[in-house]
Amino acid sequence: MAATIKWWQQAVVYQVYPRSFQDTNHDGIGDLKGITAHLDYLKQLGIDVIWLNPIYRSPNDDNGYDISDYQQIAADFGTMADFDELLQAAHDRGLKIIMDLVVNHTSDEHPRFKRSRQDRTNQYRDFYFWRSGNGKKAPNNWEAAFGGSAWQYDEQTQQYYLHTFSTKQPDLNWENPTLRESVYTMMTWWLNKGVDGFRMDVINQISKLPGLPDGPLKPHSQFGDARVTNGPRVHEFLQEMNQEVLSQFDIMTVGETHGVTPADALKYAGADQHELDMVFEFQHLRLDNSQHGLGKWSTRKTPLVALKKVISDWQVGLEGRAWNSLFWNNHDTPRAVSRFGDDRPAYRVRSAKMLATCLHLLQGTPYIYQGEELGMTDAHFTELASYRDIESLSAYRDLVTERQLLSPADMMARLAAASRDNSRTPMQWDTEVNAGFSDAAPWLTVNPNYRQINAAAALADPDSVWYYYQHLIQLRHQYPSVTLGSFELLWADDPQYSYMHGNGKADLASLLQFHSRDTVPTTGSISDPTAKCLISNYGEQQPNKLRPYEAWVYQLA
């Protein structure tokens, strides 16, 4: 891969969740003009690419992941003219913009779905999955991602349609070539406007198993797993997409691919596969999942030894053959410092810096989620009424109200630890009302710690998390060994995280403490008297001791 380095392999991506970034029209909802207003902030941070969560027209059943028109901007966010202004302003600053592409499903308010449900013979019927049930039973036992059956009965034509997410998100039938061609036409339209690529939502679910067979029953449930990931034609579809659209432009693509292994990733993003540039994998985010059949609704902490193994497996498994995406959090997860670090005031800054150090010196393209560079924390909501996320509210209804597997107090603790709303609270800009996000009531409650954690305070403090991120980004751009070097995990079973990265010349060594207690560091190859410290979250090293959440990066001669 060293001979053909692509621009996106040396880039750092910043994810913007538009609804929560900046409101400029006083309605409590972030908008495109708000993003444009902060481009200089992002440029100063040093990032190269902005990934926008969906901004298309949508009823917002799932915060924009239910699209009713792919070629119009949601009124909440502004107009197409606002988008064109944002795109031009970003390009003028040397920043690229990639769009969120959601083509596993649409909104049930999309004109084609409305026409699809009118009768059984119209030209759009086969754009979606329509099936007759078994008497009063759904066509199969699949459970939707947000709970309940993945099938919704429609009175008008007396058949069911498939929705692997909410009832307002019917799945598209990629077996239909006319449907696929319409998707490619839409993608080309955006690329011709000048966007620089796509992040593809649940893209490994676009090929379903033939016959849509029942899935194995889930624990404590009448429903089975939906058989929708890594289907038999998914690579055929993506290769066709690449040939028809992606290969015609100098862009970057990243696919959200739940349930993949490094071996699977080579099929999606291998240098010789002609599909995607990289994938989002989630193995490291599942290590703290419940061991009692409750999935993500857990309060467990991630075991460090297991985390090191997963990261190592991906670094080694893809080296020279595919490209990693690197991230701790996004719009679907809790905040990184609360989940993998320690958000208590005594440790928040140190642990946020340590986590950043760990991630940004691995091989791959790093993704920073908005507010991560400030060390923003989980919201720690204590009332169900504070939540807006459909997944969280559906889980409470399922696990507490309907199946009564958890008490209200237990479920609230799990929501506080794992809800998607933890990462969706408004961006914390300053100490003004609503953290400077909006002068109106915000769509989601602002984290009350904004008076201590905000961008204005960070920019005024040379020792802030923000400036540490800026330094790390500069190091990535400065040292080719980060992009090109080989990865070696050191002391896999130790209670610290150490690895080397390089090609034998000016190798980099990282030493990381994932605990709030002191430990004795394992030395070995890092104890090089000629080593030069490139970055650390402590002022000076203490011999034979790693302090809470300490991080050091050395350049070895």
From Swiss-Prot:
The record marks D332 as: Transition state stabilizer. The active site is at D201 (nucleophile), E256 (proton donor). It comes from the Bacteria. GO terms for molecular function: alpha-1,4-glucosidase activity; alpha-amylase activity. It is an enzyme of class 3 (hydrolase). The keyword Ribosomal protein does not apply. Gene3D superfamilies: Glycosidases (3.20.20.80), Golgi alpha-mannosidase II (2.60.40.1180), Oligo-1,6-glucosidase, Domain 2 (3.90.400.10). PANTHER family: ALPHA-AMYLASE FAMILY MEMBER (PTHR10357), OLIGO-1,6-GLUCOSIDASE 1 (PTHR10357:SF184). This is Alpha-glucosidase. It comes from Pediococcus pentosaceus.
